[in-house]
A protein has these predicted regions:
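C-terminal membrane-anchoring or membrane-association module
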Residues: 705-720
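Substrate-recognition/cap regions that form aromatic- and gly/pro-loop-enriched pockets
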Residues: 334-465
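Histidine-centered catalytic/metal-binding microenvironments
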Residues: 442-511
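A contiguous strand-loop segment
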Residues: 26-147, 168-308
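Proteolytic processing hotspots in large secreted/extracellular or virion-associated proteins
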Residues: 512-515, 519-522, 544-598, 631-633
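Juxtamembrane/start-of-transmembrane alpha-helix segments at the extracytoplasmic/lumenal side
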Residues: 689-702
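Proteolytic cleavage junctions
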Residues: 568-573, 586-588, 595-636, 640
Length: 720
């Protein structure tokens, strides 16, 4: 009983979306083989899911359904519309990309797209909205009619050619009706068919021309079709009659126009924006305008030499009006999404439009069919689960017998072992933090896609011309290679996801504990730490020959000290602090050391930034540090200088002020003894650099001797 209630609730909800004439769900394209760079046919679709509460977060699986034998009486059932059909005694193997929620009584299968073992490929559907006047004459059959949720699982197991698939759909609609208006694509290595389901029992399908391309969203686009050309057209017998009976029959240039006779009177804003964007992206010189009353389905590029690649169609499905600066994607506007309840068809701000690469995409796919490959291969599907904005397209042959485990995960919420949830999370982070990631994530995938495209082309060349028998014999080796490759790519996805999570955590931690940066203007030395706000830094640049333990080596030495700004009291120790020191552009750094009170030097771990010409290390003490170079350099004796930098409490880019004064002490004496260790925060006498109140006895001694010598010199002068 509960399942029945849920099922009818879903039906009512779906109907409310359909009748609203505003459904932001799915965009499709076709490019004939005469217009592609490699002579392949390409078609595909983005499956959008704008429905609350998920709104673009709806897990999709990618699976292979093995060939099966059924007993008499076995029935295929659609949970959404109640469509049923007897299973055949034997049904073919096929792949599909279903919803994870299938089979729970509240959600249909929605297999989306796939190949079967005979090389038939299919994507279903781009939902289309029939005109209300037509629906009064030929209503949709929402109880028992054929609809999107079951189409893939009904057609692919039963047909051996694309035409057979169209004929099966047509026959079923004649007998049982259609639950929805739909656009469907079926292909094999010989031909591709484009089919529009126009109302409860009306439809027209055409064999797609090899020299045309098409872009279509959630409405109808077929113009005049020669309904008598049965070799290239499959149509319901009453398609003109129903339009006339509905008083919605339209002619253009004296010929029956299918789309204008079955469409709503005007394109929905979301349909117009996507189709216009797609046409102008693929054909920049087109004369089409945004306000055109009709967008023709069959198109030729204005430039007769224009040819399209995989990268072009990936860019099409990712497009966010980058080539149309007058528009912005409406998912940036923070407004109610069009299509949620049908009440927001016209955007409040006309700048914001519904994009092809929108936030609601849950599954994008590109099918590439090459007639050089055996039919058993089907072709290649480039699968882009999740939003297209920041997720990669990964290639799979139609001949595979299994898919990687991460594609089968059926979690309804984030699961780290799910391919869908991983890429969805990557897109979410990239989209919500464009200031952090920019286009870096997309560019990473595009670089990998270049490699995969080249690799796939090599594989296609190897398999071209194989007999069907030889091709079938390769199914398992190819599957094993595909599983291994999927594992490798999934680990790349997880690594990127982990890096992004860590980056955002670092930023969040920084906001909670903002790092203050002190920079000494005279030397360019800077230190960074969350707790420098009330401190000042004093830097003494030492004479080049002042550290005896480094005698004969080329180095720069600095005495870095901290004190409280309020009372000038020296600070002896601080938590881990990053110190950055500029280095000579013409020399290579050998090591970084600090000098302890005894004049001994100890090596530090450091990192180099060749572009900025700096080195950085982490310490919790402040004393004398030296950057030692590998090659001896000409040194000049300069006077030591001291500069003081006062801390400020803003972020890492804080500008500070410096006051330069003459030094009051000389550098520490240095011995010839050298030891090597890694700095730690543990305080050990004679090993860690002295700081603040731990005043160097050597420096005090040198100072006292200097004062005594000065006293006697002055006294001697007075006597003279």
């Amino acid at each position: 009983m509960k399942k029945t209630v849920i099922r009818w609730a879903v039906v009512v909800l779906l109907l409310s979306f359909l009748l609203s004439q505003v459904v932001q769900a799915c965009s499709g394209f076709i490019i004939g083989k005469g217009l592609t760079t490699d002579g392949s046919v390409m078609f595909g679709r983005t499956e959008d899911y704008p429905y609350p509460p998920d709104n673009g977060a709806h897990n999709k699986n990618y699976i292979v359904n093995p060939a099966r034998d059924y007993a008499d009486g076995a029935v295929l059932v659609d949970e959404t519309f109640g469509f049923t059909a007897p299973h055949l005694a034997h049904e073919y193997k096929y792949s599909s990309t279903p919803d994870e929620a299938r089979g729970d009584g509240s959600n249909g299968i929605y297999g989306a797209h796939g190949f079967n073992e005979h090389g038939v490929s299919m994507t279903a559907t781009v939902t289309a909205i029939p005109n209300n006047k037509v629906l009064k004459v030929d209503p949709l059959v929402t109880s028992g009619g054929l609809g999107e949720p079951i189409l893939i699982d009904y057609v692919l197991p039963r047909v051996q050619t694309a035409r057979e698939g169209v004929e099966l759909i047509a026959k079923t609609i004649d007998e049982k009706g259609s639950a929805e208006g739909n656009v469907i694509i079926l292909a094999d290595k010989s031909e591709l068919w484009y089919m529009e389901v126009l109302s409860g029992h009306q439809y027209v399908a055409i064999k797609f021309p090899e020299d045309k391309f098409a872009i279509f969203a959630n409405t109808y686009y077929l113009g005049h079709v020669d309904l008598t050309d049965t070799a290239n057209v499959i149509a319901s017998k009453d398609v003109e009659k129903v339009a006339k009976k509905a008083d919605n029959y339209v002619e253009i240039e004296g010929q029956f126009h299918i789309a204008k006779s079955y469409d709503p009177s005007n394109y929905a804003e979301a349909d117009r924006s996507r189709v216009y964007a797609g046409i102008t992206l693929l054909d920049p010189q087109t004369s089409v305008t945004y306000e055109d009353s009709v967008f023709d389905l069959l198109r030729s590029p204005t430039d007769p030499n224009r040819r399209y690649s995989l990268q072009d169609v990936f860019a099409l499905q990712r497009n966010r009006f980058e080539h149309l600066p007058q528009f912005l994607p409406d998912d940036l506007a923070g407004k109610v999404k069009q299509g949620d309840d049908g009440s927001n068809d016209q955007p409040t701000d006309a700048t914001y439009k519904y994009a092809l690469g929108n936030e609601n995409v849950i599954d994008a796919h590109v099918y590439q069919i090459k007639d050089s490959l055996p039919a058993a291969f089907g072709g290649v599907v480039w699968l882009g689960l999740g939003q297209t904005r920041n997720t990669p397209y990964v290639p799979f042959y139609g001949i595979v017998t299994d898919t990687y485990e991460a594609f089968k995960n059926r979690s309804a919420s984030y699961d780290t072992n799910s391919w869908y949830w991983t890429v969805q999370n990557i897109d979410k982070m990239a989209s919500q933090h464009p200031d952090v990631f920019g286009r870096t994530i997309l560019e990473k995938w595009q670089a990998l896609e270049e490699e995969w495209i080249a690799h796939q082309a090599n594989l296609d060349s190897q398999y071209a011309g194989l007999t069907e028998e030889a091709a079938i014999g390769l199914a398992y080796p190819i599957t094993n290679d595909t599983l291994a490759r999927s594992e490798q790519i999934f680990q790349q996805l997880k690594a990127v996801e982990a890096e992004m999570v860590a980056k955002l955590k670092e930023i969040d931690d920084h906001k909670k504990n903002p790092v203050t940066k002190l920079t000494d203007e005279a030397t360019g030395i800077s230190i960074a730490n969350p707790n420098l706000a009330s401190l000042e830094m004093t830097v003494l640049r030492l004479d080049p020959n002042s550290v005896q333990a480094l005698a004969g080596q080329s180095y720069d030495a600095y005495d870095i000290r901290l004190a409280k700004t309020s009372n000038k009291k020296a600070v002896t120790q601080l938590e881990a602090t990053t110190v950055t020191i500029p280095v000579k552009a013409t020399a290579q750094v050998d090591k970084v050391v600090y000098v302890n009170d005894a004049g001994e030097v100890q090596s530090l771990k450091f990192t180099s930034d060749a572009e900025k010409k700096t080195i950085s290390f982490v310490t919790s003490h402040f004393s004398i540090y030296a950057v030692v170079y590998k090659e001896a350099q000409t040194t000049t004796t300069t006077s030591a200088s001291t500069s003081t930098t006062t801390g400020a409490t803003t972020g890492a880019g804080t500008t500070t002020t410096s006051a330069v004064t003459k030094p009051t002490t000389s550098s520490s004496s240095a011995s010839t003894k050298t030891s090597s260790s890694t700095t730690t925060s543990t305080k050990k006498k004679g090993t860690l650099p002295s700081t603040g109140e731990q005043i160097s006895m050597v420096l005090i001694g040198v100072g006292i001797v200097g004062l005594i010598a000065a006293f006697f010199i002055l006294k001697s002068k007075k006597k003279q």
